[in-house]
Amino acid sequence: MNYVLKVPVAICGVALGFAALGNLFKASFEGFYLACGIISIALLALYTLKFMVSTKTVLRELSDPIGLSVSATYPMAVMLISVYMKADIGDAAQLFWFAGIALHILCIALFTSRYIAKFDWENVHASWFIVYVGIVVASVTAPAFNFETSVGTVAFWFGFICLVVLLIVVSIKYVNMGRCLILLSRSLVFMQLQQAYVLQDMYSP
């Protein structure tokens, strides 16, 4: 059980990766497609078990902007896996798909209330794209459930608009960070040169 408690939230991203990778081989290599689906489900089940065993541990992981944003890969993976499940459980898979969408919307709402309503440049990271642009997975999977003209369209445009906005915001953050690092490195070099001159004066005859 201790092993389960050590499972990081990033494992949800790995599950998402396997689910997406399997979809690429759905038509050409069904065996690989199914294997990726099984691995993805197993990884999500592992993190779900961690949540059930120690909810406080999971909530503590989600208490910072990076942890919370990475957790959005969980509902994204659920949406993709629901397409896998449709072949076996039929229309019931649609319930999992809607559950994934609802959970992702919850992530967006929670993240917005914490880090957009109380905006701070220190909390801006590239992982913000996962939260706001990740909902586009609903658009990609919508045709499997005949919702491409409704849910799919809304999810696509929401994600696209967020992508444009975040490209600007995140770029500003990292450009400014790069400038700060350059200034810091120059300051350190200047300080080292000063120390070198001082030492030279001290030990020169």
Show the residue positions of the predicted features.
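N-terminal signal-anchor module of multipass membrane proteins
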Residues: 1-48, 53
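Juxtamembrane helix-loop boundaries in multi-pass membrane proteins
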Residues: 1-20, 55-80, 97-100, 115-140, ...
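A cross-family "folded-core" feature that marks the main globular domain of proteins
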Residues: 23-24, 47-54, 107, 111-114, ...
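Helix-coil boundary and interhelical linker segments in multi-pass alpha-helical membrane proteins
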Residues: 23-31, 83-95, 140-153, 201-205
